């Protein structure tokens, strides 16, 4: 086993020494036809979201999802440089992951089934979105201390059974709890291509105060940010070129927010989320502001006492520039269906990463 791990690390390490150009990664959770409506020029990867476990194996849920995946992969004909990955899990989509992946036999069966799906669909790899190994995630989903080591072996098995040129990545929670308890970074990172750092959802349905849910920088009221998360990963020895900063193409809102400091860092109750399109229906109710310290936009509806937190063109541009300045692997975002078809946030992202 030690020899196998060494050979796998050596192979991937050689690949990691190649000069990496910053990339744009898009998660896609849409239907079969909508993907055709987006301009994907400049997008390096689309991660089709999501596939799930069926017993010990990776499985596509139904025929509709198969057709959608096929059409996403067909985009490679129009965009020859595009890579398409499948993703396991997502929020609420990995209910049995902890239990299934506790078995060596199951991890091997999963890896074999993953390689089969990638080959049969002519996909380019897999992104693991297990939320979360070793710590609590979706309410009611099991987790155990051993998940951390089991995740490492899961990566080893995937590398063993996937082709060498297939991409292997995973989505990581942007919290110190995740960093410390979910991943054996020194063992996992030499075997994967990159980590997609979910630098969003810092505030959400469980929050009792408002804040920037996808802040680039920290401020005196909010420690969690993209910068602090990335610095923490680097301190754990993760190479900048393997880290992708995350952008959020959706808006989170909170209600019953007092008209103090334009609603920022105030007591609140969760309201709802919007995408870039349906937020236009209520946009006129809001006044828009910018936090110079957190490098983040926010908005406040003083009539209805609603606070909104999001990424906009300015913050996406700053995140993209940060990725360039820090020589990160690039920037990723959740998700394409939340964007506008014309002059959306993706266009700003691509134009900044690839001027």
Give the positions of each predicted feature:
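Short, acidic/polar
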Residues: 28-42, 104-120, 176-187, 230, ...
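Substrate-binding surface in catalytic domains of secreted glycosidases
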Residues: 25, 54-67, 112, 133-281
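Short acidic, glycine/proline-enriched helix-loop-strand junctions
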Residues: 137, 142-151, 164-166, 291-293, ...
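Glycan-binding loop/region signatures in secreted carbohydrate-active enzymes
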Residues: 88, 247-322, 348-355
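Sec-dependent N-terminal signal peptides
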Residues: 3-13
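Short, well-ordered coil/turn segments that N-cap beta-strands
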Residues: 20-22, 42-44, 80-84, 122-126, ...
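Conserved, mostly hydrophobic/aromatic
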Residues: 46, 86, 128, 158, ...
């Amino acid at each position: 086993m030690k020899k196998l791990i060494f050979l796998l690390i050596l192979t991937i390490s050689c690949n990691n020494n190649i000069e990496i150009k910053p990339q744009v990664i898009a998660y896609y959770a849409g239907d079969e036809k909508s993907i055709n409506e987006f301009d994907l020029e400049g997008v390096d990867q689309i991660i089709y979201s999501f596939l799930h476990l069926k017993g010990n194996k990776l499985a596509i849920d139904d025929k509709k999802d198969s057709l959608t995946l096929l059409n996403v992969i067909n985009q490679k004909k129009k965009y020859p440089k595009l890579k398409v990955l499948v993703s396991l899990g997502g929020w609420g989509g990995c209910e049995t992951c902890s239990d299934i992946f506790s078995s060596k036999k199951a991890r091997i069966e999963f890896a074999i089934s993953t390689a089969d799906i990638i080959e049969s669909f002519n996909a380019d790899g897999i992104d693991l979105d297990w939320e979360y190994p070793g710590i609590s995630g979706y309410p009611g989903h099991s987790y155990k201390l051993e998940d951390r080591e089991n995740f490492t072996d899961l990566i080893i098995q995937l590398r063993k059974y996937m082709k060498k040129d297939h991409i292997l990545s995973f989505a990581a929670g942007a919290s110190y709890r995740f960093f410390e308890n979910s991943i054996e970074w020194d063992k996992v990172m030499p075997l994967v291509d990159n980590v997609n750092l979910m630098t969003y959802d810092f505030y959400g349905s469980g929050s009792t105060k408002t804040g920037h849910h996808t802040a680039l920088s920290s401020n005196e009221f909010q420690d969690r940010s993209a910068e602090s998360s990335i610095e923490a990963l680097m301190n754990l020895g993760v190479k900048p070129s393997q880290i992708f900063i995350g952008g959020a193409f959706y808006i989170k809102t909170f209600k019953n927010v007092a008209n103090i400091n334009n609603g920022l860092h105030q007591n609140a109750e969760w309201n709802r989320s919007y995408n870039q399109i349906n937020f236009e229906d209520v946009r006129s109710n809001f006044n828009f502001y910018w936090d110079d310290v957190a490098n983040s936009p926010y908005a406040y509806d003083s009539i209805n006492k609603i606070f909104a937190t999001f990424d906009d063109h300015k913050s996406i541009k700053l995140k993209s520039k940060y990725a360039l300045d820090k020589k990160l692997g690039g920037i990723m975002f959740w998700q394409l269906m939340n964007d506008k078809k014309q002059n959306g946030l993706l266009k700003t992202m691509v134009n900044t990463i690839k001027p």
